[in-house]
Design a protein with these regions (language model features):
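Amphipathic protein-protein interaction modules
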Residues: 72-131
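The feature represents the first ordered module of a protein
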Residues: 11-97
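Short N-terminal edge-element motif at the start of the domain
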Residues: 1-8
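Long, highly charged low-complexity segments enriched in Glu/Asp and Lys/Arg with interspersed Ser/Thr
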Residues: 120, 124-162
Length: 162
């Protein structure tokens, strides 16, 4: 199969999109990097009628690791530790001790006026995670294409899925 050109215009745009894919958590889908089609796919774990979302037979793909909830939680703690305003940090720490800490943290950060700093922090960290994953899995973006060393890729086969 002939590989297509990447829809990503730069290495940075690919890393940013990969970072988003790594941070999306859905128990019903896996994220794949399709090297043949040059895109990121969210693939249903169960058979569905949405077959167009699946890689084509013979496509070269690699499963994209997810950022765990614990890793994301730890980033909230690190962000709080970086804030020097003693009036804000207790409010953010309290938000981490409720039943739904991620939503509570976002709400507390919004009310404290640090939500933009949080999102900048989070974007930088997620992009670093994406770069690390790329390095560990032999993935790069060169000459307008996503390339791989082949050590971690596999050829998609419907026989493997059924």
């Amino acid at each position: 199969m002939e590989e297509k050109n990447s829809p990503y215009s730069t290495r940075e745009s690919f890393i940013s999109e990969l970072a988003v894919a790594m941070s999306v958590y859905n128990i019903y889908e896996d994220q794949y990097l399709n090297l043949t089609q040059q895109n990121l796919l969210f693939v249903q774990r169960e058979n569905t009628v949405w077959d167009e979302k699946w890689p084509a037979e013979g496509d070269k793909v690699i499963l994209v690791d997810r950022i765990s909830s614990q890793e994301a939680f730890d980033q909230m703690v690190e962000f709080i530790d970086s804030i020097e305003d003693e009036n804000i940090t207790p409010k953010l720490y309290r938000a981490l001790n409720v039943r739904h800490p991620f939503g509570a943290f976002r709400y507390a950060a919004e009310r404290a006026g640090v939500i933009h700093q949080w999102y900048q922090w989070l974007d930088r960290w997620q992009n670093e995670q994406a770069k690390e994953w790329m390095h560990e899995n032999g993935i790069d973006f060169k000459d307008g294409k996503i390339v791989a060393d082949g050590k971690h890729t596999f050829v998609w086969s419907w026989k493997r899925r059924h």
